[in-house]
Amino acid sequence: LVAGELAPAAGSIACSSRPYYVPQHLSAAGISAVGVLGVADKLDALRAICGGSADPRCYDILADDWDVEARCRAALDHWGLPHVGLTDPVDALSGGERTKLCLAGISVHNPSVILLDEPTNHLDTSGRRRLYDLIRASRATIVVVSHDVALLNLLGTTCELSAKGLKVYGGNYDFYRERKRIEEEALAQQVDSEQTALRLARKKAQEVRERQERRMRQGERHKDQLPRILRRTMKDS
């Protein structure tokens, strides 16, 4: 929804700038590296201009981003992809290389909002280290969905999504786990207290019923005894 791939069923999502999205699984059929990086049109415009074109549309597309090709090349090299050409097809890359290619786009675009969906699933050790370093150094708003505890501990806020809705915890994953432990212990104590109170209430109700039953039995005995007392009194008189 935040990435804009799905429309919300109700309400709306507002973002100050277009988020940069790194998907868990990249559909790569027929896409080149620059297509994944989102700069194919700019590179085409740059090459047209360098080839002598004076078409104003090319200048509009490039938007004075003259070093876009150099940034792309530097980003691929940084992520351990020096062997990947900008026009190479992505379907020839491994899962880890595709993830690195998507992550390289962060350096190309320098976005203010980054969405990462299970980004370390296919990364090797060096790739994970580069990602951790990126997150430590970044000033962007980064939203991560991950099972990687080391990654989650680099983030300042943890959100838990459940059937009850979204709950925000003001800390990293270790902080979240500690808060959850405290909440679960408090809930267990509350349940235990409620069960104890219920047992006491049932015991009290049972005692009340037993007292009422004793009084009723005593009342019945008094009724049975009253006629005999009256007859005995009449005989004595």
Model features per residue range: what roles?
Residues 52-67, 82, 186-237:
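Flexible nucleotide-interacting loop at or near the entrance of a catalytic core
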